[in-house]
Amino acid sequence: MAKEKGLTPQSQDFSEWYLEVIQKAELADYGPVRGTIVVRPYGYAIWENIQQVLDRMFKETGHQNAYFPLFIPMSFLRKEAEHVEGFSPELAVVTHAGGEELEEPLAVRPTSETVIGYMWSKWIRSWRDLPQLLNQWGNVVRWEMRTRPFLRTSEFLWQEGHTAHATREEAEEEVRRMLSIYARLAREYAAIPVIEGLKTEKEKFAGAVYTTTIEALMKDGKALQAGTSHYLGENFARAFDIKFQDRDLQVKYVHTTSWGLSWRFIGAIIMTHGDDRGLVLPPRLAPIQVVIVPIYKDESRERVLEAAQGLRQALQAKGLRVHLDDRDQHTPGYKFHEWELKGVPFRVELGPKDLEQGQAVLASRLGGKETLPLAALPEALPGKLVAFHEELYRRALAFREAHTRKVDTYEAFKEAVQEGFALAFHCGDKACERLIQEETTATTRCVPFEAEPEEGFCVRCGRPSAYGKRVVFAKAY
């Protein structure tokens, strides 16, 4: 069936399926520069819905939007040694402008900790200036060697939050608060189950004291880091001399955080829920929640379209995102296929016989059709969209549970990471972690916050566990 509809089956080649569905569902296309993509209106509408949800949650927690320059002096990046070392291989650098060589090369923003740190050093003087709670919506450039649409691109859209606090306690509370917002976005809006946890020293953000993350499992058994929140301690404050006078007139360094989520979240939605017929979009983020496909011949066209338009208005009055596909140049069958490919949760089929009987056919993207009274649809569909979300989440959670294994031997570990998450003990040594990656291509995803305390011995080297609980390992995007 997938072949007939022009998609490679997931079981045959998941990577090829992913690339095909992005193009055929008109989410994105390849840009003229290697590693760049053009996000088409349907794909951008998903990003806008993600933005709206996050922006509301950020503002509810006291954050304000701001914008900082795209060009950053290279000297800024060099001020934080770990930071520049971590980003150097991915930097795009401007050396000439206006036909002349620049006095100082400028990095094209890979992330904004440095330029925001510089500005805070000018703005923050007293405890009264704290906390600083900022968010920036924008683009960043990281010159990735191996690119894949939405997951790794040379330029991508994201939000990056940056906050400064008087105490470590306040900053750490912020780190967890923002991670929980990302987890809410995943679970409550994208229907994606995620594991919240701590990154290992090897996997943490360059320049952070520690990094927290939400990790999701894709249908091919690979993990995807869907959002991160970092405690930066005084690292950037010391590098940029961001000091304040506290209530006792003591001069101290601020404690900073940063946190970000990019359009790779769209990739997570595609790979968590999609099937051989195309996308399956979670209703709360879908650009179109209900598509109405009128079915008519010339003599019934006007009557059917009038009823379809009335239904659209009634559904929109309930706050639903509705599209009426009244194109004459395509058959109903073509339209059914197109909207299945694009992952619209519900399709309403409305023909002259349906009108005579005062009913319509409702088809779910999760499978199954039912006939309902036309007048009942505006009341029924909001609840059906909730049930659709819950079923989508249930299926994704069941998949994750079926592809998560506790392992205690390296042989069992190697088998487990071929299929999904392996829960294993680890010694915490970076060299041991690197060897595991070289030998299996699996990496540590996180030390889960919710995992039960448990003692054991490293799955590879046999030394005692460093974390007092099992670590999540997987192959990853």
UniProtKB/Swiss-Prot annotation:
A GO molecular-function descriptor: proline-tRNA ligase activity
Oligomer and partners: Homodimer.
Keyword Transport attributed: no
Catalysed transformations (reactions): tRNA(Pro) + L-proline + ATP = L-prolyl-tRNA(Pro) + AMP + diphosphate
HAMAP family: Pro_tRNA_synth_type3
Keywords annotated in UniProt: Aminoacyl-tRNA synthetase, ATP-binding, Cytoplasm, Ligase, Nucleotide-binding, Protein biosynthesis
UniProt gene name: proS
NCBIfam families: proS_fam_I
Keyword Nucleotide-binding assigned: yes
Pfam families for this protein: HGTP_anticodon, ProRS-C_1, tRNA-synt_2b
CDD domains in the cross-refs: ProRS_anticodon_zinc, ProRS_core_arch_euk
Cross-referenced Gene3D superfamilies: Anticodon-binding domain, Bira Bifunctional Protein, Domain 2, C-terminal domain of ProRS
Name recorded for this polypeptide: Proline--tRNA ligase
